[in-house]
Amino acid sequence: MSEYTTREVGALNTLDYQVYVEKNGTPISSWHDIPLYANAEKTILNMVVEIPRWTQAKLEITKEATLNPIKQDTKKGKLRFVRNCFPHHGYIWNYGAFPQTYEDPNVVHPETKAKGDSDPLDVCEIGEARGYTGQVKQVKVLGVMALLDEGETDWKVIVIDVNDPLAPKLNDIEDVERHMPGLIRATNEWFRIYKIPDGKPENSFAFSGECKNRKYAEEVVRECNEAWERLITGKTDAKSDFSLVNVSVTGSVANDPSVSSTIPPAQELAPAPVDPSVHKWFYISGSPL
């Protein structure tokens, strides 16, 4: 049984919905308190699932809230859902983030020529099991894509759950194409077109959309972990609304174990209904698989 569990507050598909990660029953920060590396060799990493595969609610670790619960993103006070771009439905992987990482907006990457997007590092977990919001999965890194999102570098790390049946066969990005043909191409297309139904242009990529290999990806992860260390210890100025509060990080600027007791109790509430228009399929010209 995992030492990590979840505490849900409010109903899914409402503004009140929050998912806290707990360790041994005590709320912790989903961004700061979960170790990035799950083993001493740094070959297995922890990821936090934000959005289970095939779902549409844009759930994400909230950088501004105490202990960084996962909430649904909003725009102009309304909940945000990703659109279904044919032939995809929702997110096509378990989508989440690496804890203890930060894409530093003060650093321009020498190869992408763009600064970081000020978020934890995004992760696409490609295993067969659907995850759940707040789940902490142990994964291994396979590769990385560099999305250029409105002038910022937005890395997308490709990983697989170490417990997946295919995990022993997948050790680098070329193994993904061998054993899961079409997935990398579909991933590239998904990120390229997913904003088009909302009236935005298609996204572009560094490296002409190439998915870089495991070694390159592991270096990106290491750099973003170091950027987080600078952030949590006060060596990098955090945005004024970031919450760096944690219960376990030695040397951090905001360590406060007592804060766990202030988190609301769990609530078992049924999901709220969503507008049927959320489920519409959009057909994007020029996006053949």
Swiss-Prot record:
One of its GO terms (biological process) is phosphate-containing compound metabolic process. It catalyses: diphosphate + H2O = 2 phosphate + H(+). GO terms for molecular function: inorganic diphosphate phosphatase activity; magnesium ion binding. Mg(2+) 2 binds at D122. Mg(2+) 1 binds at D117, D122, D154. GO terms for cellular component: cytosol; nucleus. Its cofactor is Mg(2+). Pfam families: Pyrophosphatase. It is found in: Cytoplasm. Its main location: cytoplasm. InterPro entries: Pyrophosphatase, Pyrophosphatase_sf. Diphosphate binds at R80. Keywords: Cytoplasm, Hydrolase, Magnesium, Metal-binding. Its EC number is 3.6.1.1. The keyword Secreted does not apply. It is an enzyme of class 3 (hydrolase). The keyword Magnesium applies. Homodimer. Belongs to the PPase family. This is Inorganic pyrophosphatase. It comes from Schizosaccharomyces pombe (strain 972 / ATCC 24843) (Fission yeast).
